[in-house]
């Protein structure tokens, strides 16, 4: 078993989005065979690029306010919201608040970037 605080994992800048950083809190290094758990921080005014990929996402909003684009619509986000993004669906997360938008994102191990 591995138990630790998420801040014990190094915060890394996202490669294709300014103002977006993440921690891979559970993944290949921990010998997780199926899934990767990541914690994202999106700075105020920042967003991920609109993009698609072959794997799904499961997201849980921890703090902050924002919106998610997906399936041709936008939805406002706040703590406690959950989001399912199917594979190959264009999507984007944007921070619309004045504090960090923080969320947990689960993906299959095969989707780890």
Predicted feature residues:
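A short, N-terminal "cap"/entry segment at the start of jelly-roll beta-barrel domains
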Residues: 1-34
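Conserved short histidine dyad/triad with adjacent acidic residue
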Residues: 38-53
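A generic "binding-loop/recognition-motif" signal
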Residues: 46, 54-55, 73, 89, ...
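Histidine-centered metal-chelating micro-motifs
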Residues: 47-49, 67, 83, 87-93
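Glycine- and acidic-residue-biased ligand/ion/polar-headgroup-sensing regions
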Residues: 55-66
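Short acidic-glycine-tyrosine-enriched beta hairpin
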Residues: 73-87
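Ligand-binding loop in jelly-roll beta-barrel domains
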Residues: 87-112
